[in-house]
From Swiss-Prot:
Annotated residues for binding of GTP: 19-26, 81-85, 136-139
Leading EC class: hydrolase
Record region (G3): 81-84
PROSITE patterns documented for this protein: G_TR_1, G_TR_2
Pfam families: GTP_EFTU, GTP_EFTU_D2, GTP_EFTU_D3
Protein name, entry field: Elongation factor Tu
Location(s) in or outside the cell: Cytoplasm
Reactions performed catalytically: GTP + H2O = GDP + phosphate + H(+)
Entry's EC annotation: 3.6.5.3
GO CC terms of this entry: cytosol
Annotated spans, G5: 174-176
Length: 396
């Protein structure tokens, strides 16, 4: 009897299957659970159960995603699979299911198709660190030369989107054979080979605690006789009493010292990733700091106004706009804890953006925000979410 609860002693990693419709992403997901179930590293989840992925709402957007978990000798994995192309786009842009790496599934009978290309581009834009390729359905191709050509095509495509196409592991196999257990060479063994590649090629993600200290400011209080307290949830890293930090965003960056940390009215000597804390800061007046700024380790993050982004625009059905928007559209961009107005620049040759579209937008904010590539944001009009995006590159 497989244990229902995994022992979380191994390092954890979030991955997902991406690729063109009907190339076998869901079959492969099922096959991985079946093969790893033999060693007690998973509970077998069949195709039908993964395919009827439940709907979730993330930032007001409806996304269908299936989650399975399994473990190898090396790691514990949370694996996400989406039923439809639109779900992938929304998932990757909102970061609803964080991906530390991806398994790109390409059918040997078709080779790379439009969504193969689109998912690779999305992975590049939203900062998925590494991909591994599973060439599926090799049982349907008799000619070994065709397999070589498909592999070459996939590698070239990956390189064209700045992934290391020559180095990425490409494993050839058949998810269906792994599921029905009829041909171990391209079935079970290929899945084991794939998981070994995922274990070794996808880098172990850095834990939030190991990153530099960052806390988005949610509220500011003044405590008579003590000074100014800023509250928020520590996103990454840790802060100790007596350490110097910077207040970044909206106004000029300034340094201060954290002279006290409290949580649930108790004084602590430090606050760390995941904690909701109040930080007492020295020499800063109540009116000199505001929601939307961040407290951060000095030099670790800079404020910016101009960036390009990958954006999903909510459809009318999702409660988004009913009409398209054009160049110089001026909505609010919601970063972490606050809205900042910004102007939008459309890609060359794009006249307008329709609700339901996925588009690359240039943005110019009226005030600088502490940001880095990969930061997620919402686009809002009068408090209503009309889009979701991720910073893909910073220009100013």
């Amino acid at each position: 009897m497989a244990k229902a609860k995994f022992e979380r002693t191994k390092p954890h990693c979030n991955i997902g299957t991406i690729g063109h419709v009907d190339h076998g992403k869901t079959s492969l997901t099922a096959a991985i659970t079946k093969v790893l179930a033999e060693t007690g590293g998973a509970t077998f989840v069949d195709y039908a159960n993964i395919d009827k992925a439940p709907e979730e709402r993330e930032r007001g957007i409806t996304i269908s995603t299936a989650h399975v978990e399994y473990e190898t000798e090396q790691r514990h994995y949370a694996h996400v699979d989406c039923p439809g192309h639109a779900d992938y786009v929304k998932n990757m842009i909102t970061g609803a299911a964080q991906m530390d790496g991806g398994i790109l599934v390409v059918s040997a009978t078709d080779g790379p198709m439009p969504q193969t290309r689109e998912h690779i581009l999305l992975a590049r834009q939203v900062g998925v660190p590494a991909l591994v390729v599973f060439m599926n359905k090799v049982d349907l191709v008799d000619d070994a030369e065709i397999l070589e050509l498909v592999e070459l095509e996939v590698r070239e495509l990956l390189s064209s989107y700045e992934f290391p196409g020559d180095d990425i592991p490409v494993i050839k196999g058949s998810a269906v054979k792994a599921l029905d257990g009829t041909n171990d060479e391209i079935g079970r063994n290929a899945v084991l080979e794939l998981m070994a590649a995922v274990d070794s090629y996808i880098p172990q993600p850095e834990r939030p605690l190991d990153k530099p200290f960052l806390m988005p400011i949610e509220d500011v209080f003044s405590i008579s006789g003590r000074g100014t307290v800023v509250t928020g949830r520590v996103e990454t890293g840790m802060v100790k009493v007596g350490e110097e930090v910077e207040i970044v965003g909206i106004k000029d960056t300034r340094k201060t010292t954290v002279t006290g940390v409290e949580m649930f009215r108790k004084l602590l000597d430090q606050g760390q990733a995941g904690d909701n804390i109040g930080a007492l800061i020295r020499g800063v007046g109540r009116e000199e700091v505001e929601r939307g700024q961040v407290l951060a380790k000095p030099g670790s993050i800079k404020p910016h106004t101009d960036f390009s982004s990958e954006v999903y625009v909510l459809s009318k059905e999702e409660g988004g706009r009913h009409t398209p928007f054009f160049a110089n559209y001026r909505p609010q961009f919601y970063f972490r804890t606050t809205d900042v107005t910004g102007t939008v620049e459309l890609p060359e040759g794009t006249e307008m953006v329709m609700p339901g579209d996925n588009v690359k937008l240039g943005v110019k904010l009226i005030a600088p925000i502490a940001m880095e590539e990969g930061l997620r944001f919402s686009i809002r009009e009068g408090g209503r979410t009309v889009g979701a995006g991720v910073v893909s590159s910073i220009s100013k």
